[in-house]
A protein has these predicted regions:
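Acidic Gly/Asp/Thr-rich repetitive segments characteristic of extracellular carbohydrate-active
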Residues: 98-143
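Right-handed parallel beta-helix
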Residues: 163, 168, 172, 188-199, ...
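Cysteine-centered, disulfide-bonded loop motifs in secreted/extracellular proteins
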Residues: 524-536, 540, 554-562
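Acidic, divalent-cation-chelating loop motifs in proteins
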Residues: 520-524, 545-553
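Bacterial Sec-dependent N-terminal signal peptides
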Residues: 1-37
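Extracellular beta-strand-rich, repetitive "passenger/adhesive" scaffolds
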Residues: 115, 169-176, 195, 541-544
């Protein structure tokens, strides 16, 4: 690695790559003052950022002014609006799962049950028939798709009104992908399935997540593909509640949250921020997910309380696997699978790290760490850590292991967990690679490449990069932050890191694919195709039947369609022995 004052985008020669990565890991602590510098913007870029943020804030205020009266009206009619929620009990819970197969802290979210059905028919950023129209509306709502393709956002799309379900599995053909800007959740009772969020922008002006926001709670995310974020791919752990103009904002944990069967991969390292996720909250659970080819935060724990991390797969981390929390935090790390990749420094502590609890947020004059229950985790290639996760897999700041802290940290029984079906780590590895991400209506080529990299240990990359900004669009980057070739001067990895899985531009792994599909016939625009309604005795010319429940099982007719249920069969969904992913079992929505 060259001197900090010179260009340090060295080439990753495979012969000495591991030696350099060990050095990188050992120097990680010092990066806070030297290498982890944030990019500096030009004056013009700063002015652009200020102008954009003011415009976005104005737009959000206008959106909320229209939605708020509807939200308040529905609250008076039985759908409470609780923006200050900070405890799991602050939000009411449904009596049946958000959908069959929902598990964990968010499994009893209402989503948009019983609300208006919005059918997305346009890929435009805004206007009639768009995703933005549906998400920015007030009132309970369920969003289905009758179009396929890329929805390229021109500004962040923020969900402010509660009670929303987005059913990405209903898109025809190849499905949809949200690109260009952040998709954010700033409310409660949100259910999202089979959606792709790939921001994909590398301009230094706006370095944000692909999927995140200011989430309040009752969040149920299933089969999400979150990639190409410039900060993190997907983050849910806290929200800031503003009591009023004369009060300071209060930080509160996101409550009742689940992320399951999802992918957080290929965060963009253009400015040293290839980070997977910051997660946490109260009554939170994260299971059967994949974190792949993010340098750090795989994931980071951003809240105290009990952090449930079960049956996940982590691959090709560089300087951070999982870390965070404080002395109040409690961790359940159960039956996860860790696979070091080409850029994982296998000969350093981080190379076999399962979890590094931290104390920095505690603001104490002494070191005190949270408590950890860790069992059944596999560290591929490391028999010692696999046999005993505490033999090097659980680490603390500044030490290779937990020597001197183990007695305080180690728990021998799991902390209280919400309902989660748990499998062995090896079975979880196979399950995640076969099922994670937006697999319906079909898994796209980007996720196929991500999964194949994990299986083979070899990165997919294009052999000939584009001539224009092949390492990312760094227009707006101040001269003092630029290397000789115009890239970010203080980037830790070399320009060819994409050959080993860490990318700085989506084009390095092929860029956005095309998505095609034929719209379904839906005469009454109620989100249920005519053929499906006719088959099950509903009226294809009466939109009101979407919100009815033809068999009394608790799911409305539109929910029966989007979740692959047979309306002729009534099932007791309160009985968790019946709680399985009916949509996956059917292979998608019925045509």
């Amino acid at each position: 690695m060259t001197d900090n004052n010179n260009k340090n985008n060295y080439t990753l020669n495979p012969k000495n790559m591991q030696k350099k990565l060990v050095l990188l890991a050992l120097m990680a602590f010092s990066f806070g003052t030297t290498y982890a510098q944030y990019p500096q913007l030009t004056s013009a870029a700063k002015a652009r950022v200020d102008s954009m943020q003011k415009a976005w804030a104005k737009h959000q205020a206008e959106v909320w002014a229209k939605a708020e009266p509807i939200v308040k009206k529905e609250a008076a009619e039985g759908r409470p609006y609780v923006p200050w929620a900070g405890r799991p009990t602050d939000l009411p819970q449904a009596k049946i799962p958000a959908f069959p197969g929902a598990e964990g802290g968010g499994m009893y979210s209402f989503g948009g049950r019983g609300g208006k059905v919005y059918v997305v028919t346009s890929l435009a950023d805004s206007g009639p028939g768009t995703l933005r129209e549906a998400c920015e509306a007030g009132g309970a709502r369920i969003v289905v798709f009758n179009v396929s393709g890329i929805i390229r956002l021109k500004s962040p799309l923020i969900v402010q009104a509660p009670y929303l379900t987005i059913a990405g599995q209903t898109a025809p053909g190849d499905g949809v992908c949200v690109a260009g800007q952040t998709f954010g959740v700033d409310t409660h009772d949100v259910v999202i399935r089979h959606m792709r969020f790939r921001r994909g922008e590398t301009n230094v002006d706006h370095r944000e997540d692909s999927f995140g926001g200011n989430p309040v709670g009752n969040i149920m995310l299933d089969h999400i593909s979150a990639e190409w974020g410039l900060d993190e791919n997907i983050s849910f752990y806290r929200h800031m509640w503003h009591p009023g103009a004369d009060y300071k904002a209060e930080k509160r944990g996101t409550v009742n949250v689940t992320i399951q069967n999802s992918i957080s991969a290929k965060a963009l390292d253009t400015y040293n921020h290839s980070f997977g996720s910051t997660l946490g909250g109260e009554n939170c659970s994260f299971m059967r997910n994949l974190w792949s080819c993010n340098t750090g935060r795989n994931p980071s724990i951003g809240w105290n309380g009990i952090f449930n991390f079960v049956n996940n797969v982590v691959y090709n981390w560089v300087h951070r696997s999982s870390d965070g929390g404080d002395y109040q935090a409690m961790f359940n790390f159960i039956n996860n699978y860790y696979k070091p990749g080409p850029l994982t420094p296998k000969d350093s502590p981080v190379g076999h790290r399962i979890l590094k609890p931290e104390s920095g947020r505690s603001k104490l004059s002494y070191k005190q760490y949270g408590r950890v229950y860790a069992t059944g985790n596999i560290m591929e290639g490391n028999e010692r850590v696999t046999k005993d996760n505490w033999d090097g897999g659980i680490q603390v700041e500044g030490q290779r292991d937990t020597k001197g802290y183990t007695e305080q940290m180690r728990a021998y029984e799991p902390f209280e967990m919400p309902y989660v079906q748990i499998m062995g780590a090896q079975k979880a590895y196979d399950f995640v690679l076969a099922n994670a991400g937006a697999t319906l209506p079909k898994r796209d080529i980007i996720d196929e490449r991500v999964i194949d990299e994990v299986r083979t240990g070899q990165a997919y990359y294009v052999k000939k990069l584009p001539k224009d900004n092949p390492y990312g669009d760094v227009s707006g980057l101040a001269e003092k932050s630029q290397a000789e070739d115009g890239t970010f001067k203080y980037r830790r990895l070399g320009n060819d890191s994409y050959k080993y899985g860490i990318i700085t531009d989506p084009r390095q792994m092929g860029g956005y694919p095309e998505y095609h599909g034929t719209p379904r016939v839906d005469s009454d625009s109620d989100g249920m195709p005519d053929a499906w309604e006719k088959k099950y005795g509903l009226n294809p010319n009466d939109a009101s039947d979407a919100s009815l429940d033809c068999n009394g099982d608790g799911y409305t007719n539109i929910e029966k369609y989007i979740n692959g249920l047979d309306p002729r069969v009534k099932i007791d969904w309160r009985n968790l022995s019946n709680n399985y992913d009916t949509l996956a079992a059917r292979g998608g929505v019925e045509e």
